[in-house]
């Protein structure tokens, strides 16, 4: 399998005969609009093409993806239902799922799980791989700014969603999860709790924009917990991954 880091929380998964693009925000070029690994390569890649969006926030859902069907009329879009409810897309634009619902065809299964923000997180089952994209699921709190009650509630809400996921998927091959230093000193707490609760084979940080150092700071914790950790160094970076 090839994992492509596009930007922020945007990734692509390449397997034989299939490409999956998740939470596209911007393409990988830092200088040219609509240039990079998506426009220059992935949209031309042979095989099935799935485009997923976990929620309507603009750093996870760029309406430009709907224009890709002009080039690739075979695209299958799978979006979280909040995108429809917030009128970011029309009913006919995609297949919509929310927590507890599934999209499945002969190639892929996508189970929607919860979020501690809006929308969903997605668990993909593809060619013997289980792949979890957290969307905006995280223990979102800002220790220097949040009240004790806000911190407590964030912790309770997050652990409840992780528990629900663990009941269905106690082991996951590949996890893409927010590690965002803008949250302050406890910014890695949610990622650490996730790894402690769910047996994760490979962990990949996301949602850090250009802060590669902050995203990769979880590496030692993940390795000590028995995870393989993928350190990202630039937009458009590709990784050949085996179990």
What name fits each language-model region?
Residues 2-5, 20-23, 109-114, 130-136, ...:
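Active-site-proximal beta-strand elements of phosphoester/diester hydrolases
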Residues 4-6, 19, 88-103, 183, ...:
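Binuclear metal-ion centers of metallo-dependent hydrolases, dominated by the metallo-beta-lactamase
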Residues 12-52, 63-68, 137-168:
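Pre-active-site segment of Zn-dependent metallo-hydrolases
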Residues 21-25, 47-59, 77-81, 132-135, ...:
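Active-site neighborhood of phospho(di)ester-bond hydrolases with catalytic His/Asp-centered motifs
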Residues 28-29, 56-61, 83-87, 101-103, ...:
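Active-site environment of divalent metal-dependent phosphoester hydrolases
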Residues 38-103:
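Active-site HxH/HxHxD metal-binding segment of metal-dependent hydrolases
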Residues 74-129, 230-243:
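Metallo-beta-lactamase
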Residues 116-196:
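Active-site-proximal loop/helix segments of hydrolase catalytic cores
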């Amino acid at each position: 399998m090839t994992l492509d880091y596009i930007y922020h929380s945007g990734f692509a998964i390449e397997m034989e005969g299939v490409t999956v693009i998740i939470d596209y925000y911007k393409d990988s070029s830092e200088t040219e609009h609509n240039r990079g690994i998506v426009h220059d390569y992935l949209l031309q890649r042979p095989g099935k093409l799935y485009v997923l969006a976990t929620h309507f926030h603009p750093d996870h859902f760029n309406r430009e993806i709907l224009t890709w069907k002009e080039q690739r009329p075979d695209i299958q879009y799978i979006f979280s239902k909040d995108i429809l409810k917030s009128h970011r897309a029309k009913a006919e634009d995609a297949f919509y799922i929310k927590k507890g619902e599934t999209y499945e065809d002969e190639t892929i299964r996508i189970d929607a799980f919860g979020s501690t923000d809006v929308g969903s997180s997605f668990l993909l089952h593809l060619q013997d791989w289980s792949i979890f994209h957290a969307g905006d699921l995280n223990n979102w709190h800002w220790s220097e700014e949040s009240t004790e009650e806000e911190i407590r509630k964030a912790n309770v809400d997050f652990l409840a969603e992780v528990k629900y996921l663990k009941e269905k998927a106690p082991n996951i091959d590949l996890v893409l999860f927010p590690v965002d230093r803008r949250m302050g000193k406890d910014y890695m707490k949610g990622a650490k709790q996730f790894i402690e609760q769910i047996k994760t084979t490979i962990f990949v940080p996301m949602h850090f924009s250009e802060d590669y150092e902050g995203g990769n700071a979880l590496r030692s914790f993940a390795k000590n917990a028995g995870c393989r950790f993928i350190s990202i160094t630039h937009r458009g970076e590709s990784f050949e991954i085996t179990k």
